[in-house]
Every structure is written in C-alpha cells, then in structure tokens.
Amino acid sequence: MRLLRSILYRLYAIYDKACPLRYFIQKIRLYYAKNVICRSGSRFANTVFEGDNLVHKRSLLVDSYLSRHSYIAFDCRLFGARIGKFCSIGPRVYTGFSNHPTDTFVSTFLAFYKDTRKVFGYSYYTGLQPGFEMYRKTASGYLVDIGHDVWIGADVKIMDGVSIGNGAVVAAGAVVT
C-alpha cells in the first residue's frame, strides 16, 4: 500500500490537467528511464536529459542539453542552452534572445532583416547584412554554454553567444552579455 501511494503521489506531481497526454507520457518515460522529474506545466522540445534532473513548474526547454544532477527552477525559458553537471538554475532565467541589427541601420521589425514571406506574406529583406548574426552560437554549437557546478540566481537574462565557466555564480537580476 505504501508503494502504491508513493507511485500515485509521483504521478500526480507531474500530471498537468492542461497538458496533452503525449507530454505526460514523455515525463513518465523520463522519470523511469533517467530519473528526471518534470513538474506540472513544464515543457521541453528537442532537449536531451542525461539523468537525475529536476525541472520545476512552468519551465520551458527547447533545443537544449541538461547534464546530470542539474536543477531548473520554475518559470525558466531556456532556448539553445547546454547546461553542465551539478548546476542550479534559479527561477525566471531566460536564454535564447535573438539580436537586432544596429551597425548599418536599426530595426526591431523582423521583416527588415529576415525573409518573412512565409510568415507575413511580405518581406523587406534584401540579403544578409555584413557582420550581422541573428543568433550567436558558442563553440559548442549552442546559443548559451553553462559550465559545471554553476549557480544562477533568480531573474537572470543570458544573451546569445555567452559561455559561463565552471564554478561560476551569477547574481540575481544580472544581464549576462
């Protein structure tokens, strides 16, 4: 009976009423195969988990790699991040910001610096601006590279192309460029 209660408690902890069944099944598989706990509301796409991880509520991981024994707090948005072992990522940490051109002209509207005909039906894009990279990648091929045993505080924003070394501590509210 005790074992059954334990199993039901763990299932309830990751169950999300608004979550499609396929996410629930993925979370169950991750838990039993790699001891990865993904709380309700957490989502991931094209993300690799090494195992023994915890992803808290409402966090989103896309195109990322999470090494062993790393922890993601609630409300994080991690796009293209490689996270090392034994990392603690605080709440509301964001990665994967795209850049806007500022050298030859300044624009915030996507249609001026990227071909948007498929999305909007029109585009003002005339070709790649020299020296402009919309997404800057690190040497590992990810947008953000976080080393081993790193502690990142709450409300941190990490820009594209940043590598954070092993053992680093990033203060709460920091913008890492």
Where are these regions (language model features)?
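Domain-scale signature associated with acetyltransferase and cell-envelope carbohydrate enzymes
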Residues: 1-149, 155-156
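Beta-rich strand-turn-strand
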Residues: 158-165, 174-177
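Active-site Tyr-X1-5-Lys
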Residues: 171
